[in-house]
A protein has these predicted regions:
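Short acidic-glycine-tyrosine-enriched beta hairpin
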Residues: 155-173, 335-353
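N-terminal secretory signal peptides
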Residues: 1-36
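Short histidine-centered beta-strand/loop micro-motifs
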Residues: 130-134, 161-162, 181-182, 310-315, ...
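Histidine-centered metal-chelating micro-motifs
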Residues: 128-130, 149, 168-170, 174-179, ...
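Mobile, glycine-rich extracellular loop/lid and propeptide segments
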Residues: 130, 140-143, 149-152, 161, ...
Length: 424
C-alpha cells in the first residue's frame, strides 16, 4: 500500500471521529436543555398521557411549595402619628372687651384644621360687632343663647336685616359686608364658622380700621362727615363696641329704595324635623334646603346618655365639631394601624379629616349636644352599618373569617345612633 493510500485512510478516520464527537456534543446539549425541573417538564414533555402525568406532578409540587413557603408581607410603611384633633376653644384667651369677647381657633392654634376656622363670640346687651367683611372666607353662624340682629349687603344691592334666636343660623358669602348686634335682654353667645382654616377673625376688614387709614380730606369727601367729626372717630379698629339696644321692630334702612332680601341668609335649624334614632337625633342643613350656604353644611346632633354615633366617614369633606353641652369620646382611624381617642367637654372643638373613620361615644349622665360643620355644599356620609348591609353574607364570612351565624347578627340597615349599650 502506498503512502498516499495510507494518508487518505487516516484522514477519513479522523473525519469520522470528529463527526461522532459533534453528534455526542449535540446530544449532550439537548439533554442539558431537558433538565428535570418544573419549567422543563411543562415546556418540553409532549402532552401524551405520560406528559400529562408529569405535568400534574409538577403542579402538585408547586402547590406543595406554596403551602410550605411562608407568606411574604409587604414592608410596613412608616407613617407619621395622627395629629392632635382636639382644641379647647372656650378655654383660650382671645379678645376680651367691655361689651364682648371673641375666642378663635385657626391653623395657627390648631394645625390640623386646614379647612375651617371657628370663633366663639359673646356680646353683651347692645354690644355691636361692627360693620365689616371677610375677604377670603364665608361666615356661617349658629346661635346658642340670646338674640342677635344682623344687617348684610350683597354685591347686587340687595340688603337684609334679620333677627336670630337660639337654634337659628346665618350664612354670609365671602365679601358680603355685615354687622351683628345683641338685642338683649341677656348675653348672646354664638359660634362663627369660616370655610378657610387660615382665616383669622382678628384680621377682618372693619370699617373703623379703614376710615382711620384714609386722609381726613378723602374721608370727608366720601362720607359727608366734617373734618371736626372725623377727628373724633376711633383711631383704629373698634371691633366690638357698645351700642343702644335697638327697638324690637327693625328700623327701616336709610335708603328708602333699598332692595330688601327676604331672609335668604337665615335658617331656623331647630325648627327642622330631626332624624330620630334609638340613641338620639340629628338635624342636617345643607345647600339643598338652605340654598345660599354653598360652602358650609351644618348639623346639630343630640346624644342620649350611653348612646353611640356609629362608625362612619365623610367622603367629601372634613368635619369640625363644637361641643355645646355634655361630654363624649371620639375615636378616629387614619389607616396604617393608626387610631386615636379623645374625650370632649363643652367649649371644646374636634377636627376630623376628610375620609377618616370615626365614632362618637356619649359619656356621662347629661345628654350631649354637638354642633357639627363641614366645608362643603352637600352632606355625604358612609356608615359601617350601611356598608355591611350592602354586601353578600358569604363575602363577609370570608373577609372576617367568621360564621354565617355571626354575619346574621350584623346590622341589615343604617343604625346611625345606637341606644345605650345596644349591639345592633
Amino acid at each position: 500500500m502506498s503512502d498516499e493510500s495510507n494518508g487518505s485512510e487516516a484522514m477519513a478516520a479522523e473525519n469520522e471521529a470528529k463527526l461522532a464527537g459533534s453528534e455526542t456534543n449535540e446530544t449532550k446539549s439537548r439533554l442539558g436543555d431537558l433538565k428535570l425541573t418544573r419549567r422543563s417538564l411543562l415546556g418540553a414533555v409532549p402532552l401524551t398521557t405520560a406528559g400529562l402525568s408529569l405535568a400534574s406532578l409538577a403542579g402538585a409540587g408547586r402547590a406543595d411549595a406554596q403551602q410550605m413557603k411562608p407568606q411574604i408581607r409587604r414592608e410596613k410603611r412608616k407613617e407619621p402619628p395622627l395629629e392632635n384633633f382636639k382644641y379647647d376653644l372656650d378655654g383660650s384667651t382671645g379678645f376680651v372687651g367691655e361689651v364682648g369677647t371673641a375666642k378663635e381657633v385657626t391653623v395657627a392654634e390648631f394645625p390640623v384644621s386646614e379647612s375651617i376656622a371657628g370663633v366663639s363670640m359673646v356680646l353683651k346687651p347692645g354690644g355691636i360687632r361692627e360693620l365689616h367683611w371677610h375677604a377670603i372666607a364665608a361666615e356661617w353662624a349658629y346661635v346658642i343663647d340670646g338674640n342677635v340682629r344682623t344687617t348684610v349687603l350683597g354685591p347686587t344691592g340687595e340688603a337684609a336685616q334679620d333677627d336670630f334666636g337660639p337654634g337659628d343660623l346665618w350664612y354670609f358669602p365671602k365679601g358680603h359686608p355685615h354687622a351683628l348686634q345683641n338685642l338683649g335682654p341677656g348675653d348672646a353667645h354664638f359660634i362663627l364658622v369660616f370655610d378657610d382654616g387660615h382665616f383669622s377673625e382678628f384680621g377682618t376688614f372693619s370699617i373703623t380700621d379703614w376710615f382711620s387709614q384714609v386722609s381726613p380730606d378723602i374721608l370727608s369727601r366720601d362720607s359727608g362727615l366734617s373734618l371736626q367729626t372725623i377727628a373724633g372717630l376711633p383711631k383704629g379698629e373698634a371691633y366690638i363696641t357698645p351700642g343702644r339696644i335697638p327697638p324690637r321692630s327693625p328700623a327701616p334702612f336709610r335708603d328708602g329704595d333699598a332692595i330688601i332680601s327676604q331672609s335668604a341668609h337665615k335658617f331656623r335649624m331647630l325648627e327642622r324635623e330631626p332624624q330620630k334614632w334609638p340613641g338620639g337625633e340629628e338635624r342636617v342643613v345643607d345647600s339643598h334646603i338652605f340654598p345660599i350656604s354653598k360652602t358650609i353644611v351644618g348639623a346639630i346632633m343630640d346624644l342620649q346618655p350611653g348612646a353611640l354615633r356609629e362608625m362612619h366617614w365623610h367622603p367629601n369633606a372634613d368635619e369640625w365639631q363644637y361641643y355645646i353641652k355634655g361630654r363624649a369620646r371620639v375615636g378616629i382611624f387614619g389607616a396604617h394601624g393608626r387610631s386615636k381617642v379623645e374625650e370632649f367637654a363643652p367649649g371644646q372643638v374636634a377636627f376630623i379629616k376628610q375620609g377618616f373613620g370615626h365614632y362618637i361615644e356619649q359619656v356621662g349622665d347629661e345628654p350631649t349636644r354637638i354642633l357639627i360643620t363641614f366645608p362643603a355644599a352637600e352632606y355625604q356620609e358612609i356608615s359601617v352599618s350601611t356598608w355591611l348591609s350592602n354586601n353578600p353574607s358569604l363575602l363577609l364570612e370570608d373577609n372576617f373569617g367568621i360564621s354565617a351565624a355571626d354575619v346574621a347578627r350584623m346590622p341589615k340597615s343604617k343604625m346611625a345612633i345606637y341606644g345605650p349599650h345596644s349591639k345592633g
